[in-house]
A protein has these predicted regions:
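Conserved active-site and SAM-binding loop architecture
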Residues: 30-250
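Intrinsic-disorder-associated, low-complexity terminal segments enriched in Asp/Asn/His/Tyr and depleted
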Residues: 10, 16-21, 26-29, 39
């Protein structure tokens, strides 16, 4: 049906902007965009620009590999060695921060910034660890890179710096988990996610995942409770979010 629709309008060419408006133009133009413009008539995907992408403070390789799968030149960086094969710099991100990146996805440590650790904030203020965390966060956020996403859980940077541009959940993008994630964006659009199917898009939202309720009344995602004491597991980016970043920003 889509082939008939496209082949029946200007033989696969973009419609003439000077002709009178037709009620079906909006639908046609949306299909034209989704299917790749003039290349869609030939079954060829539109050529995309290859970006140099730095994924800062990532040892899992999840976001890095999502961008590589899209044809980009991506490299992860962390003080820890990588968990999976692929381009990775083991060391300080500041060693390579100014190496001509087009985009950076940064995951600065949240240990001293997240609201979940509020009970220890006074101690962290006194020993300087919180200020070190703030300084590290801001150096990444203010880096001389055209496109930047800084990711962190809900924490003090929302008040010390500015509110995040977007707050997302893994279940928005196909993973049945809850993990409130804040994104501060520079020259990047908010990640698109779809609650329910519509004419053009399939829903990306899924179930939120199992929750655990403690005797105190506190409620917590089961996966998060079971990963207590494993900060590395809790810090990983979910596959659905990584894929959305690569598809929409790459």
């Amino acid at each position: 049906m889509l082939r008939l629709l496209l082949s029946g309008r200007n033989n696969g060419r973009r419609p003439d902007k000077d002709r009178s408006y037709c009620p079906h133009d909006d639908i046609y133009n949306r299909l034209w965009s989704i299917l790749g413009g003039p290349d869609c008539a030939r079954g060829v995907r539109s050529v995309e620009v290859r970006l140099r992408v730095l994924v800062a403070c990532e040892f899992s390789g999840i976001v890095r590999d999502a961008f590589i799968a899209r044809g980009h030149d991506a490299m992860s960086c962390d003080l820890l060695p990588p968990e999976s094969p692929g381009p990775h710099y083991t060391g300080s991100v500041f060693d390579i921060l100014n190496d001509g990146w087009d985009m950076m996805i940064a995951h600065p440590p949240c240990t001293h910034l997240a609201c979940s650790g509020a009970a220890w904030f006074e101690k962290k203020k006194k020993n300087g660890k919180q200020q070190n965390g703030i300084d590290f966060f801001m150096k990444l956020a203010e880096a001389s890179i055209n496109k930047i996403c800084v990711e962190n859980p809900v924490g003090i940077m929302s008040s010390l710096w500015r509110t995040p541009d977007q707050i997302i959940q893994p279940y928005y993008f196909g993973d049945e988990y809850q993990k409130t994630t804040c994104l501060w964006l520079k020259n990047l659009l908010k990640l698109k996610h779809i609650k329910v199917d519509d004419l053009f898009d399939k829903a990306t939202h899924v179930n939120k995942g199992e929750m655990i309720k403690y005797a105190s009344g506190k409620v917590m995602p089961k996966w998060y409770a079971e990963s207590r004491g494993n900060g590395h597991l809790r810090s990983r980016t979910f596959q659905g979010i990584a894929k959305a970043m690569a598809e929409q920003w790459g």
